[in-house]
Amino acid sequence: MVLELLKNNYERNDEHYYNEKVENNTSKHKKKKKKKKKHILVEESEKYDRNIDSENNEEAYNAYELIKTKPNNIYEEKYDFSFQNLDKKCLREKNNMRESYRNSKDIIQYGTNENDIFTEDMLENDNFDDDSFVEDDTMDYKTYNSYTKPEFNLFSKYSTESKKKNIMNNKKHSKIEDFYKKYKNNSEYSKQANEHDASIIQFLNNNKKSVDCGKMKDINFKKNDSQNYSESNKYKNEFFKNYNYDNKYTNNYAHDNNQDSNSYYYADENEPKDNHEEDNDTGDTYADNEEDEDNRDDNDDYSQYNQCEVESDTNQIRPNEKRYNESIKHINDSNLKINKELLLKRETYTKRDNIFYIKKDIIPYKKEHNNNRFSLYDSSKNNNEHNNNYEIKFMNYKKDSEKEGEQWLKNIKKEKDEEFLKKYMYENALKKTHSSKDLQFNRLDDEKNILHHDINVDNKMVRLDKYERSNIRDMRNKTNKCNMLRHDTAEFNKIRRKDEINNYSEYANKCLAGNIYEEDDSYILKRNELGHKELKVIDNPILNINPDDKKKPNIKSFLDKIKYRKNNELFLKNEHEKYVGIQETNKKDKIKMKFADILHTKNFSNFFHRGKNSIAKSLSPNNDKKNTSFNNEVFNLNILGKNDKNSDYKQYNINCSPYDHENTSFHPSVREETKYYENKESRKRLDYNCDEDNYIENSIQRYHENNIDYNSINIERTINLREDIKYNEFLNKPDKINSENFSNNFNDNKQKSLKNDDSNKIRDTNKLYYHDHLENTMRSNYIQKEYTEKISDILESNSNNMRKFINKMDYYTKKYEQNLYKNDEDIYTKENKFPDSRKEFYNKSDSPMKVTDGIKDSQYENYNRIKYKLKMKQEKQDKEDETDINIDKKLSRKMIENNKLKEENESNDELIVTPFYIKSKIDKVLKNSEIFERSARATFKQFDVKNKNFLHFSEIESLIQKLCYNLELPPVDKKILSIVYKDYDSSKNNCMNYMDFRQMYWDLLKQIKKKYYPTKNFKIKRNCIISRKKLQGYDYSSIYNYLSFKKILGCGAFGEVHLVEDNICKLYKVVKILKKKKMKNIKVNEEINVLIYLDHPNIIKIFDVYESVNCTYIVMELCEGGELMNKIKKPQIFSETYIKNIMFQILCAIAYMHSNNIAHKDLKPENILFKTDGYDTLKIIDFGLAELINKSEGISKTAAGTVLYMAPEVFKKKFTIKCDIWSAGVIMYFLFTKSLPFTGNTYEEVKQNIFNSEPDYQFLKLKMSKPALHLLKLMLEKDYSRRPMAAVLLHHPWFQGYFDPIDILPSTLNNIKSYMKHSNIRNVIVNIMAHELCVINNHVKYINDIFLKIDSNHNGSLSHREIYNVLSNAGVKKWDINRIIQALDVNDKGCITYTEFIAGCYRWKNIDSTFLKAAFNKIDKDEDGYISKSDLATLVHDNGVNNKDIENFFISVHSIKKNITKDKKINKISFEDFKDYMLSTF
């Protein structure tokens, strides 16, 4: 009890303790005078007002008492104790610390200075009364987080003369700094600079920075060229792309040799590169986004200058761009000159040469130029980026044609060949009736290339559309034009053989004829089909042949000329025959036009028959001839296509897409639907529907709605129902239902039998419709029966594909709907409906179906029964969906409620007074004499109610009780208080005056502070526990002094991992060796700094770091349980409870990292290890890609990680720390299903799946509970703004069991209470031992579980409030709680870390001596085998540490020995002495 201390320390020598100290210190104060005035308070403030050794304060106060009696002017001039001389810089530092305690866990981030001692400014609370510790009950006693006026100045009430001097000096100093700072290229200061300053900055940047850059680069820096790109860059400049002609894609990710085959690492291509060369090593997962520390200072100016200049120069054309534009313009000018010559030659010649040219985009990475497909009508794929002219040759395909190309190009340029070509082309032109038609020549601007003959190129095969060609006169209005130019064939014609001449000339004649109704429109295509050959496009650019070569005699060309002349007569005969055939087809076209008009009158539905008459076929809407008239296209019902019997297209495979028929080499030939108008249903359509065009439009719409799955084609081909004789008998019956009007694969496969069947003729139109309907029903029933029997085997073997096929076969359900109702009820989907036509038919009173009422009733009953079942299934599914939605809402609401409850608990107004708040309040009163005087006088007046200027014992008793309550002290013993009262009462008549009370009040506060709220002068930072040593020399010999290598555990591109044994403490550990030569651009220190700072039970610990010239050695804890991936690969199925435990630990570690703004960026099962085989404690490793994301921005652009686990926003290179949540969701999916949710064979395929696909959540309902599924959906949310943080997810109802009340074992409470009784230096040593504690047993696992449960906000550290709640529920007194909290918080940071918590809770009594040896070696910095005072000062990196505390520690160590007296000075401690002392304290 404090009063007992006062009683024992009080000495009755006619003067009180307080006044006695005044006399003793008066002489000391006179000697120092101004020196103490200037320096004492400054020294105290530089220690953040934490030095509570009150000797200096007492001296200052005593001086104040002595000088108080002097005149006022003397006091004001010479002695100023109002603390106005406190350094302004310290004031700013204190103000910066305001509210730091309330949000200490959020503010203390990675990289902060841990030397800063936590302090509390009491004036942050405007309601706090500095003058009293014993406020009235009506006063609000605020807690540490109730600060409202951080701007309030502590010393604003006092004189400011010396403060003004400091302010003026600081202003002068700041002006000088700002003057130089202004001309530094600082983006933050640039916002405050005026225009004049900006011009100066720009001048300095343009001169100094460029010179520095030139020196660094060893080049002359060019003006207006602020950014230099290397040849390896993706783009050469801002406007023109540099294509990769070798590879189609660039490899943006590297495969690590250490990782699984499916792990790919993706790095940002646009990250800034270092200025030095890199080794071409691959395989590691590091992503370097900054320059090395060695080059950072040198490159800073250059990088800033470039960054400043890029924006200003974006609109300027750089020299390399000018050269590129000039080369383009030169090519354009040359092409323009050639085309001008062509125009001149066109005027001189009356003959026409039909040369085709193609304008085509250059795709460098596709090397299939020689097999292209082109279309005369499709203009959607034109692109004017590259206007190179190419010549098309139509030739019979031969494999050896490419070998003779170069030689042939030389031979065809001869004059004699040209004259011959001119002759026969002139003769051909004379035969044409439409020779007067001149096609348009397109000329573009002078800066662009001239478009000669534009034929759009699609794919590998040549394709000419016969159905969408328009009139030649209208072709000049389209983009794709086939213009025939008159020009010199000696320069541009490259015809090789007789067959090529025939093909080319015949096609040219057809084009010149311009008759779009002729039958042989695609003459070349048919010629190709007959010869089983293909057309070929040669994309060789036009070569300018040297004119001197034309004059040289060439024997070969002469022989070719004779050969051509011999064949000329046969050629002319063929041309004449074709011309006669054209005239005949013109007559047929006129007849076609007449019957096409008749067709639209809707009066001749019975005109068509099954004969082979060509006129009848030409009138059929499904005829394979073209029926276009003046650009009015006829809809092709058989859009699926059918193989032409004379083509090699029969082996073509149709892909699973409704539009794949458009990608074939030719348009699919139209099926001859001879039964189109012969059935009753068709006639009914013509009679009752409005017109044919509307019906066709409806057919198109229904076709697109059906979205047929074309995989059914292969299934039906497998069945091959055409060979079924019984089926052919039914096919002979001409009746068809309405769905037959649609082209489907089922009918297409039977078309051959339909064509060969002579019995398919027009039926008598007078037959009753109900007979047709009965026959149709029998036919469909039988077909369906046979069909279902034959596909049963396929259904068994490929059920999933068949299910998808049936779901999409709308045309199938329409055609055989009635029969399907009877045979197979389970394959229906929601799209099955009773046909509208059949409903209307039943509703008609005069329907002939009245004759067959029995059949109708049975069918209708079946329909109602199936409809009812479908309705019930739909209702059940709707209920399940509604239940899922309600559960999701309920779970989300519950998670939000849990988080709100957590926030309310943190911000409630209960009076939970933390020890730091009380300590800071006591420190403020004891450090400032004037504040103490005010506090003592206010307390005295508060209890002197009658203003009698003295206090009775009863009043003193009430005062002490109130003081103990506010400062959370034990209750007062009345007997001891009466003794103390008598000792301090100088009047001896039960009347204590103010002077006596002031002395007692001073002594009482000092004793309270010493026992209950002591100051910790010996503090250790975490980076002091992890030692970093530099090894001497280039060899590895020195590392063997510390570690013994046992075996290699793994190796990668940048280093190796070994199992080692510590030579000193004999503990097994793991060392990661990183070779510096292979890691020039990867900062090893980033990973080391992150691991040093992070302290969590689920994150790997590091012990030591050794650095040599060649390598860096990182010593980490050993995890013997192996990777999580190894357990996933095993066939064992995990229970949901097991997965929940794993996910809880992962999310706890993620929440801790995110609270410190650290993103791991490479979470995957390979980077999650089990500590031991017997326990499921996890450790997250490999922080090589970890990044500290700025809290203000919250966005990173350094994309890195393993592709299979990367979040969608990482691919966009704009992501937050929530990318780790996505990776955890993928791991959770992996644990439940043993498969990844997003896979692919290539990087691009995986990327597209991540962006576009969703996991099969319906399948997951069978494998996990609904809360688990809801949590998984939240984690795999593609929009990261809607993806919750890890701390929020940990309050999800799935983790409800982890929120149960925490019961702390009595043994653990005893360990904590014993821990609080020892000195701070001893507890620091125990913390070092706790860090070296790398074993996992039941006791350690229990402590880990308690730590995670106490951490209610899941930020990885325990606040004083969280500890207070748990210990108070355990029955610990609040004054003991304050002492426990202060003992656990070794560094006074305001929160308790994992290592500090385990140091106080662990049972150290039976600890192995190896951990004591490890702690001893950490303290023994000079490695001489002894702990000296200098070693302790070096350990805390503070040479000014209080020597008194260290001396007390040395005395305590040697006091356990009987032979050593306390008076003997001891300067060293051996390991044996250290061991005996530590074991005695446990």
From Swiss-Prot:
Active site positions: 1162
Enzyme Commission code: 2.7.11.1
Binding-site residues for ATP, renumbered to this chain: 1049-1057, 1072
Coiled coil: none
Enzyme class name: transferase
Domain EF-hand: 931-966, 972-1007, 1338-1373, 1376-1406, 1407-1442, 1468-1482
Binding residues for Ca(2+) 3: 1420, 1422, 1424, 1426, 1431
Bias (Basic and acidic residues) ranges: 749-760
Biased composition (Acidic residues): 277-301
Record comment: activity regulation: Activated by calcium.
Boundaries of every Protein kinase domain copy: 1043-1295
Name used for this protein in its record: Calcium-dependent protein kinase 6
Organism: Plasmodium berghei (strain Anka)
